[in-house]
UniProtKB/Swiss-Prot annotation:
The lineage of its organism: Eukaryota, Fungi, Dikarya, Basidiomycota, Ustilaginomycotina. It catalyses: orotidine 5'-phosphate + H(+) = UMP + CO2. The gene is PYR6. This is Orotidine 5'-phosphate decarboxylase. The active site is at residue 95. NCBIfam families: pyrF. GO terms for molecular function: orotidine-5'-phosphate decarboxylase activity.
Length: 283
């Protein structure tokens, strides 16, 4: 069997057992994009407007829903409508990290009711495998997917070594099929288990075309480094795309800022897809 990195998204989708991961791979192939935009804004309308601006260029929109100061269920309704209109999936970056019973409640209930609208979410393995079973109890019947945080892009992150190995091991032990991949900086599944035949997605943050860091510990690599060199599947880009909204000029002229957001979305989509085509030998 050839390395997963040499297979097309379409061929991988055909063999993918997790419904959310299958839908994501199909979307990536259909739209010719491996771009996920991380929208870390604190205003409901800005979140929706960024989705509108980047929707045609992305396969996935990543939210931190708990930072939205004027959150209501209408936001969820409109976000879901935009995902259908522009054909992308939603990833709530919740980073669950508690015992099974607690995370199942955090996932299904509370103010945000994440499981009802987010196709994919993620978790730290620090509490042990019960974090997987607790979330699977809620998410698997809904066809959702879970990513384990095997590695992080911030300087000094402790997600390495034995911890990363444990994430890979638990993903392969998961009999529910709910775990569908990792947040990681490289192809950790093949690196840690050379003979694995299970296809687990690798979504990678810390991607930028113009800067190498942010002064707060974030470290950036290019789409080519992430997709072609490291063999990852999805690039996660945040401020490199929506950053125009945070400048004084952007705050003063939002129309121009959102035009820039759209332009950057197109730029990263092209860079990510070109890197993928080179990886599988089609360019």
């Amino acid at each position: 069997m050839s390395s997963i990195t040499l297979q097309s998204y379409a061929s991988r989708a055909a063999k993918q057992p997790n419904p959310a991961a299958k839908a994501l791979l199909e979307c990536m192939e259909r739209k010719q994009t491996n771009l996920c935009v991380s929208i870390d804004v604190t205003n409901k309308q800005d979140l929706l407007d960024v989705c509108e601006a980047v929707g045609r260029n992305v396969c996935l929109v990543k939210t931190h829903i708990d930072i939205v100061e004027d959150f209501d269920m209408d936001l969820v309704h409109q976000l879901t409508q935009l995902s259908e209109k522009h054909d992308f999936l939603i990833f709530e970056d919740r980073k669950f990290a508690d015992i099974g019973n607690t995370v199942s409640l955090q996932y299904s209930a509370g103010v945000h009711k994440i499981a009802s609208w987010s196709h994919i979410t993620n978790a730290h393995l620090v509490p042990g495998p019960s974090v997987i079973s607790g979330l699977a109890k809620v998410g698997q019947p809904l066809g959702r997917g879970l990513l384990l945080l095997a590695e992080m892009s911030s300087e000094g992150a402790l997600t390495k070594g034995d911890y990363t190995q444990a994430c890979v091991d638990e993903a392969h032990k998961d009999t529910t099929g709910f775990v569908c991949g990792f947040i990681a900086m490289s192809r950790v599944d093949e690196r840690e288990r050379a003979n694995t035949h299970r296809d687990l997605l690798i979504l990678t943050p810390g991607v930028g075309l113009d800067v190498k860091g942010d002064g707060l510990g974030q470290q950036y690599r290019t789409p080519d480094q992430v997709i072609r060199e490291s063999g990852c599947d999805v690039i996660i880009v945040g401020r490199g795309i929506y950053g125009a909204l945070t400048t004084e000029e952007g705050k003063a002229d939002k129309k121009a800022a959102f035009a820039k957001v759209s332009e950057q979305g197109e730029r990263y989509k092209t860079a990510g897809w070109d890197a993928y085509l080179k990886r599988i030998g089609q360019k």
